[in-house]
Amino acid sequence: MADEINNQEVQPEFHIQRVYTKDVSFEAPNTPHIFQKEWQPDVKLDMDTKTNILADGVYEVVLTLTVTCKLETETAFLCEVQQAGIFTIGNLPEPQLAHCLAAFCPNILFPYAREAVANMVSKGSFPQLNLAPVNFDALFAQHMAQAQAQQATAEA
């Protein structure tokens, strides 16, 4: 019986404790005259994630979305959302933990952040903005490949 317990694999642990909005900001510096212009926006999305260790196996992940919308040279609006979550993660080796924190957790947070951006843009009286889904796994793989290339260059 004891051998059966010892031979069982330790299962990974993942729990969402909380998802919350940490910070929001919306600026429309060139209103109301910007509403008179033909709407052909140049929309730029910047994303960032940060991880804070809160306790052993407890992490805060913060996804920041910054959307800048310009008409020609004038800023129509600037919208920033910090969507955060507290996650309990255990029994994962380091490479999988890094992937979980950098890709899996932001993937959970993104729909909340996207909704917050869409609501603020709409309340600013601008046309609807629907941000496309983001492949955080691909971004993580790209980041890891860049880090490996930089390490190889540094060692050469």
Swiss-Prot record:
Cystine connections: none
Record Pfam families: SecB
Primary role: One of the proteins required for the normal export of preproteins out of the cell cytoplasm. It is a molecular chaperone that binds to a subset of precursor proteins, maintaining them in a translocation-competent state. It also specifically binds to its receptor SecA.
GO molecular function: unfolded protein binding
Protein name as it appears in the record: Protein-export protein SecB
Span of the signal peptide: none
NCBIfam families on file: PRK05751.1-4, secB
Gene3D superfamilies found in the cross-reference section: SecB-like (3.10.420.10)
Family: Belongs to the SecB family.
Gene Ontology annotations of biological process type: protein folding; protein tetramerization; protein transport
Intracellular or extracellular location(s): Cytoplasm
Cellular component, GO annotation: cytoplasm
Oligomer and partners: Homotetramer, a dimer of dimers. One homotetramer interacts with 1 SecA dimer.
InterPro entries for this protein: SecB (IPR003708), SecB-like_sf (IPR035958)
Gene transcribed to yield this protein: secB
